[in-house]
Amino acid sequence: MASGKEIKTKIASVQSTQKITKAMEMVATSKMRKTQDRMAASRPYSETIRNVISHVSKASIGYKHPFLVEREVKKVGMLVISTDRGMCGGLNINLFKTVLNEIKKWKEQGITVEVGVIGSKGIAFFRSLGLKIRAQHSGMGDNPSVEELLGIANDMFDAYKDGKIDALYLAHNQFINTMSQKPSFAQLVPLPELDTDNLGERQQAWDYIYEPDPKMLLDSLLTRYLESQVYQSVVDNLASEQAARMVAMKAATDNAGNLINDLQLVYNKARQASITNELNEIVAGAAAI
């Protein structure tokens, strides 16, 4: 059995770690709430611009933007959004498993795959697999902006426009609630058809004169919309990261508490055994006299 001093040292070490994990839990909670506010603030913009795109595309008879045209898929691009830091449970691993399953399905159909990766964890993972990384970005911090994402987003959009890929998919972690985050995998371009049932009456009752012409407006709106989708996915993934880290750090803090209790019990037993031995020695000495 370890000595009382050794056990005390272990208890102090675990208590120090517990303070760190508790602080990380509190920081993650605060960051998660701020990120949720950014998610809520950006969503109305994205939804409104998507509805305008639907209306303009219907008004632009005879013109189809490349981002709206389906074509035979021989090459696929994927934009994967991961985290820059760890200590967030199985968040990244679950996302990577989903992505690898999709890649496997495409390769079985003879479709080649290229990836663009946001986040250092994803970059390291896909490099280790030897996959071709078309574009990458990391070091975003806790408050990413649309501007810093334009480089990698436009790289992937240009690859689609130039015919280097025939479809682009977006993979990230979707924030459900504090205890639940799930991998999300969706087609980004060609833009999926929008359900406009609830806009039908408005579109029949109203018509618009577009300045400049609908073609120029549609070109601009589609680019802005796709950029906003990438930004929203990054913010969604960031909220998922902070929630997962909060849960992981809470579990670590609780486990540290349990370990401290166990070590304290071992220490008490060791101390009791030491006192018993000393009493036995005193009694034995008295009997010898």
Curated annotation (Swiss-Prot):
Main localization of the protein described in the UniProt heading: membrane
Topology in the membrane? Peripheral membrane protein
Compartments in which it is found: Cell inner membrane
Q: Which UniProt keywords apply?
A: ATP synthesis, Cell inner membrane, Cell membrane, CF(1), Hydrogen ion transport, Ion transport, Membrane, Transport
Entry's InterPro entries?
Answer: ATP_synth_F1_ATPase_gsu, ATP_synth_F1_gsu, ATP_synth_F1_gsu_CS
SUPFAM superfamilies documented for this protein? ATP synthase (F1-ATPase), gamma subunit
Q: Which PROSITE patterns match?
A: ATPASE_GAMMA
Q: Which Pfam families match?
A: ATP-synt
Molecular function per GO: ATP binding; proton-transporting ATP synthase activity, rotational mechanism
tRNA-binding listed as a keyword: no
One cellular-component annotation, GO: proton-transporting ATP synthase complex
> What superkingdom heads the lineage?
Bacteria
- Which GO biological process entries does UniProt record here? proton motive force-driven plasma membrane ATP synthesis
Q: List the disulfide bonds.
A: none
Give a short account of what the protein does. Answer: Produces ATP from ADP in the presence of a proton gradient across the membrane. The gamma chain is believed to be important in regulating ATPase activity and the flow of protons through the CF(0) complex.
Q: Which family does it belong to?
A: Belongs to the ATPase gamma chain family.
Matching entries from NCBIfam families are given as: ATPsyn_F1gamma, PRK05621.1-1
User: How would you summarize the oligomeric state and partners of this protein?
Assistant: F-type ATPases have 2 components, CF(1) - the catalytic core - and CF(0) - the membrane proton channel. CF(1) has five subunits: alpha(3), beta(3), gamma(1), delta(1), epsilon(1). CF(0) has three main subunits: a, b and c.
Please report the name of this protein according to its UniProt entry: ATP synthase gamma chain
Species of origin reads Mannheimia succiniciproducens (strain KCTC 0769BP / MBEL55E)
Q: What is the lineage of its organism?
A: Bacteria, Pseudomonadati, Pseudomonadota, Gammaproteobacteria, Pasteurellales
